[in-house]
Swiss-Prot record:
Record-linked SUPFAM superfamilies: SurE-like
Cofactor binding description: Binds 1 divalent metal cation per subunit.
Entry-linked Gene3D superfamilies: Survival protein SurE-like phosphatase/nucleotidase
Domain of life: Bacteria
Keyword Cytoplasm set for record: yes
Principal subcellular localisation of the protein: cytoplasm
Protein name per the record: 5'-nucleotidase SurE
Keywords: Cytoplasm, Hydrolase, Metal-binding, Nucleotide-binding
GO terms for cellular component: cytoplasm
UniProt EC number: 3.1.3.5
Catalytic activity: a ribonucleoside 5'-phosphate + H2O = a ribonucleoside + phosphate
GO molecular function ontology, one term from the record: 3'-nucleotidase activity
Length: 257
C-alpha cells in the first residue's frame, strides 16, 4: 500500500486540504496521513521552529494539527514521529488558496512543505488554486481532477524529477476557460510593497503588511502569464539557488581592483 502525507499552510480546516484528502482516499488504495498547521501560516516560507517544543493534536485517525507549527515543521516532525518504519511514498502540500507563482515560491509556506519533503529525499508536489478577487467560493474540481492524473502517473511511472526537486502546480481560476496543462518556467513577479499603519486604543502604532495583486513581467511562457490565460501550470523547482551564469563574472569582479 502506498503512503501519502498531506500538509498545507492554510491550516488544518482548509477546504483545499480536506477535498484533496477525500479525493485521494476515494481513488487510491493508499494510507493518507494529514499533518497541518493548527492556524493559517501563509507566506511563512521555509521557517522551522527551533525555540520552543511542538505538539501534535489528533483531529481523528491519521489526521493531526500542529500547534504553532509551520508547513515545514509539519513535514519534518511527521517524518520523525509518525513514520518510524516506512516513510511516505509521496508528500503533497496544498491545495493552497491562491496562486504560488514566480518569486511567490520563495515566500510560500505551501511550497516550503514540498521543499522540506525533498530535503528528506521524498518526492513532493505543491498545489495552489488561483482565484480572482470577486470569487466568493473556490471551485477545486479542476484541481482535483488534474491532481488525480498526476498522482496516478507518479505511482505508475515514478517521480519525474531528481532529488531535491519538486513539482509546483498552479490551477487557473474557475472564472476563466480552462485551456489545458503547460510545463513552464517560473515567471517574474512585480510586487507593490505596502505597509499600512494604524493606532491601537493605547496610542501605539502598528502595521499591516499588504498583499500584492498578481502583477508580473510580460513573458509569454511563464507560469504567471499562462495561469492567467486559463492554463494549469507545472513547474519543476530545484533547491540549488546558485547563479551559475554569474560565477565567471564574480571571479573577475573579485580579482579586479
Amino acid at each position: 500500500m502506498k503512503r501519502i502525507l498531506l500538509t498545507n499552510d492554510d491550516g488544518y480546516e482548509s477546504k483545499g486540504l480536506i477535498k484533496l484528502a477525500k479525493m485521494l482516499k476515494k481513488h487510491f488504495k493508499a494510507e493518507i496521513t494529514i499533518v497541518a498547521p493548527a492556524n493559517e501560516k501563509s507566506a511563512c516560507s521555509h521557517s522551522i521552529t527551533l525555540t520552543k517544543p511542538l505538539r501534535f493534536q489528533k483531529v481523528k485517525k491519521r489526521f493531526y494539527k500542529l500547534e504553532d507549527g509551520t508547513p515545514a515543521d509539519c513535514v519534518y516532525l511527521a517524518l520523525h514521529a509518525l513514520y518510524k518504519n516506512h516513510l511516505p511514498d509521496l508528500i503533497i502540500s496544498g491545495i493552497n488558496k491562491g496562486a504560488n507563482v514566480g518569486e511567490d515560491i520563495t515566500y510560500s509556506g505551501t511550497c516550503a512543505g514540498a521543499m522540506e519533503a525533498v530535503l528528506h529525499g521524498i518526492p513532493a508536489i505543491a498545489l495552489s488554486q488561483f482565484y480572482q478577487d470577486d470569487q466568493k467560493e473556490l471551485n477545486f474540481k479542476l484541481a482535483l481532477n488534474i491532481t488525480k492524473k498526476i498522482v496516478k502517473k507518479v505511482f505508475k511511472k515514478g517521480f519525474p524529477l531528481d532529488k531535491k526537486e519538486f513539482l509546483n502546480i498552479n490551477f487557473p481560476s474557475s472564472k476563466t476557460n480552462f485551456k489545458g496543462i503547460k510545463i513552464c518556467k517560473a515567471g517574474k513577479r512585480i510586487y507593490s510593497y505596502e505597509a499600512h499603519s494604524n493606532i491601537n486604543p493605547r496610542g501605539i502604532e502598528y502595521y499591516w503588511l499588504a498583499a500584492a495583486n498578481l502583477d508580473h513581467e510580460d513573458e509569454k511562457k511563464s507560469d504567471i502569464t499562462l495561469l492567467k490565460q486559463g492554463y494549469a501550470t507545472i513547474t519543476p523547482i530545484m533547491l540549488n539557488l546558485t547563479a551559475y551564469k554569474q560565477m565567471k563574472n564574480l571571479k573577475k569582479w573579485m580579482k579586479n581592483g
